[in-house]
Amino acid sequence: MQRMIQQFAAEYTSKNSSTQDPSQPNSTKNQSLPKASPVTTSPTAATTQNPVLSKLLMADQDSPLDLTVRKSQSEPSEQDGVLDLSTKKSPCAGSTSLSHSPGCSSTQGNGRPGRPSQYRPDGLRSGDGVPPRSLQDGTREGFGHSTSLKVPLARSLQISEELLSRNQLSTAASLGPSGLQNHGQHLILSREASWAKPHYEFNLSRMKFRGNGALSNISDLPFLAENSAFPKMALQAKQDGKKDVSHSSPVDLKIPQVRGMDLSWESRTGDQYSYSSLVMGSQTESALSKKLRAILPKQSRKSMLDAGPDSWGSDAEQSTSGQPYPTSDQEGDPGSKQPRKKRGRYRQYNSEILEEAISVVMSGKMSVSKAQSIYGIPHSTLEYKVKERLGTLKNPPKKKMKLMRSEGPDVSVKIELDPQGEAAQSANESKNE
């Protein structure tokens, strides 16, 4: 490493016709402006005596003069980052020929020292010299602040040397010294191909640190360069997480949509009718028959009628309202006033149960809250129906008021709700009261 720095320092001092210290090349890598400036300065003695003063003079030069000198001495392919990318992907024949001749001079024809890729003494120049330049160009394209991204040239050479030593150790352990000599060109091509992929992936990974400042210290560059598969591992981990989520998705069931209404009706009405059987002193057969009448459709009711007529008879005898349940289902009737399927927690009742609850409350046998707990009808609904039939509503509906004026108030409303003739009997009871 020291020999490489001394070689670069010797070429730099021979270009400027001065004897500077070998620690002088610790300037930035993109030294096109500072390199050309000492050519135009006349007091070279002050620069040779004081390196700090030489740096100040190099920084205070006139920029238009530096631009003209740089255009006359440099090639556009060496300064333009876009052209440099094209040169990296397809190295010219001259660079490959120089890689096999370490004794050849590393300066170009115009006297300006070349890139750090030309200072590889062991022939592996093109594969190891590309990364610092490519990384610097990639970060300049990604961030836009090229002045803060200039890597020190000595640091870039050190990084290249570390990468070279690690690659040599890994290849020497697998191939041996003879294999290392025979497969030199293959290592160059493979190393350059491996650097072509981390060039873009490394830029994507370094975009996260934009707010913290851009790459002033890149001591972690060899680690990130060798572990170029880190973004791929992160993407693979994300894909594995998505696969795990997709495999575990059948566990997340939509329970409210799957939940059946009849099951909740059975669990709730079982308690309600068992409580009613205890209060009214009825048998368990009557509670079971009430539940079956409320839940089962027409066909199953007919089969139950054929199977057990005794239970239905006992239920008819011990009915609280004195009115037997009809065998027809309210939802199955074509002339029903409620064609829509009932929804909600408290709408698991039909018009038959509602009529029975209304008649019981109007006859004074039960209160509204007691009928709510027994029949499963909401308190507000039951109270509204009772007040509507008694004519004690504060704001009665207009349509039903017209019907009340034309016909009897209770008879007309109950004929609308229950067209099977049972409403007339309950209406007569309410009139007598």
From Swiss-Prot:
Q: Which SUPFAM superfamilies match?
A: Homeodomain-like (SSF46689)
Q: Where is this motif: Nuclear localization signal?
A: 339-345
Specify the DNA-binding region ranges: 368-388
The family database entries (Pfam families) matched by this protein are listed as: HTH_psq
The Phosphoserine modification is found at S42, S63, S249
Coiled coil start-end: none
Organism domain of life = Eukaryota
Q: Where is the composition biased (Polar residues)?
A: 13-34, 93-110, 316-329
- Glycyl lysine isopeptide (Lys-Gly) (interchain with G-Cter in SUMO2) crosslink: positions? K254, K414
Broad class of the protein's primary localization: nucleus
Q: What biological-process GO terms show up in the record?
A: cellular response to estradiol stimulus; negative regulation of transcription by RNA polymerase II; regulation of transcription by RNA polymerase II
Q: Which InterPro entries match?
A: Homeodomain-like_sf, HTH_Psq
Q: List compositional bias (Low complexity) regions by residue number.
A: 36-48
* Span of domain HTH psq-type: 340-392
How does the annotation summarize its subunit structure? Interacts with ESR1 and ESR2 in the presence of estradiol. Interacts with CTBP1, HDAC3 and HDAC6. Component of a large corepressor complex that contains about 20 proteins, including CTBP1, CTBP2, HDAC1 and HDAC2.
Q: What is this protein called?
A: Ligand-dependent corepressor
What organism does this protein naturally occur in? Homo sapiens (Human)
What gene is behind this protein? LCOR
